[in-house]
């Protein structure tokens, strides 16, 4: 397993630790679905690119304060199956949180995660979860050192101009009567790097 050779700041690579199988490892929870449908993949990609374009064009009015300035340039994201597999293996462990090491031979990999739980007899759609990330823009001040990653880090990764690829995984399971939907998206190259701006202002 070549993933065991990939170096990260801490920990063992997710695919070295758990292998390449995306089989759910959720203890006594009842797994209802593991892995995104084609429609869910397309929805995630569409939502990301539409939002990136909105911000890049200077059409995002929200912020602290808004509006967000237009961007000089911003890549259009494409789906990457390797990033998606790493995300799916992690999601399949049913452990909410970031994994330690998910880089590929090509680049450092960033990550957004979301979990929605409901007592209703259905699972939250992926679109609601991605919207939670983009809605963090309301707390973001462009170019300020006061932004806290805990509050806006999902938004900043979503619109990180230099990121080119995305791949996601998910799991839907029932535990103690609650319907949990856990979504993991991996991004390459990673955003939220040091003091770099999320994008260059136009």
From Swiss-Prot:
Principal location: secreted
Record keywords, A-Z: Allergen, Disulfide bond, Glycation, Glycoprotein, Phosphoprotein, Secreted
Gene Ontology CC: one annotated term: extracellular region
Tissue: Expressed by the venom gland.
InterPro entries: Allrgn_V5/Tpx1_CS, CAP_dom, CAP_sf, CRISP-related, V5_allergen-like
Location in or out of the cell: Secreted
Residues where Phosphotyrosine is found: 107
Glycosylation positions in this chain: 138
SS bonds (residue pairs): 4-16, 8-101, 26-94, 168-185
Function: Does not show toxicity when intravenously injected into mice tail.
PANTHER family: CYSTEINE-RICH SECRETORY PROTEIN-RELATED (PTHR10334)
Protein family membership: Belongs to the CRISP family.
Protein name as it appears in the record: Venom allergen 5
Organism: Vespa velutina (Asian yellow-legged hornet)
